[in-house]
Amino acid sequence: MSRYRGPRLRIVRRLGDLPGLTRKAARRSYPPGQHGQARRKRSEYAIRLEEKQKLRFNYGLSERQLVRYVKKARRMQGSTGTNLLQLLEMRLDNLVFRLGFAPTIPGARQLVNHGHVTVNGRVVDIASYNCRPGEVIGVRQREASRKLVTANLEYPGLANVPVHLDFDKNKLEAKVTGACEREWVALQINELLVVEYYSRKV
């Protein structure tokens, strides 16, 4: 299953607020489609599937990518759900978004892919790059890049920069000081349901 490129508000109406996907809010609170307002009791599978879809659409992942992250989270020590969220939060495109360099994760991915972002002073154009504590995320030293990011910082997607990012707004760079704490994950998600969804699949 490839990365979603369709109407974003349609997804927000179905799954709820997804800060990484779009900062627009749906006008209608019920899902799209002819039977969107019908009230049916959802199965446990449907509830788990919905949580999984929230994670996938918020971080802009393909199904294959998400499965890979779930497998990696299982091999790590500690809670699989917490590990999964930390892995996704430490992706370069997500950190660029959390710093306010771009209004959404798709916007951040474009910044990275177009060579506007550096890690430890070197251009990194891989959005899925896994950032580690001690690394410094910055903006390329050229006028076009800095102008673009400065404009985006006027209207950041989220109000607060997480505590694991030591951000210097004047230099347009941030040092990663550690892994993301659970309370700083912006997405409203029950990660245990995501782990349960994949428990029999991978």
Curated annotation (Swiss-Prot):
Taxonomically, which superkingdom?
Answer: Bacteria
Cellular component annotations (GO), alphabetically ordered: small ribosomal subunit
Where do the segments described as Disordered lie? 23-42
Which GO BP annotation is one of this protein's?
translation
Q: Which GO terms describe its molecular function?
A: rRNA binding; structural constituent of ribosome
**Which InterPro entries has this protein been placed in?**
Ribosomal_uS4 (IPR022801), Ribosomal_uS4_bac-type (IPR005709), Ribosomal_uS4_CS (IPR018079), Ribosomal_uS4_N (IPR001912), S4_RNA-bd (IPR002942), S4_RNA-bd_sf (IPR036986)
In which family does this protein belong, per the annotation?
Answer: Belongs to the universal ribosomal protein uS4 family.
Q: What does this protein do?
A: One of the primary rRNA binding proteins, it binds directly to 16S rRNA where it nucleates assembly of the body of the 30S subunit.
NCBIfam families cross-referenced by the UniProt entry: PRK05327.1, rpsD_bact
The protein here is known as Small ribosomal subunit protein uS4
**Gene name for this UniProt entry:** rpsD
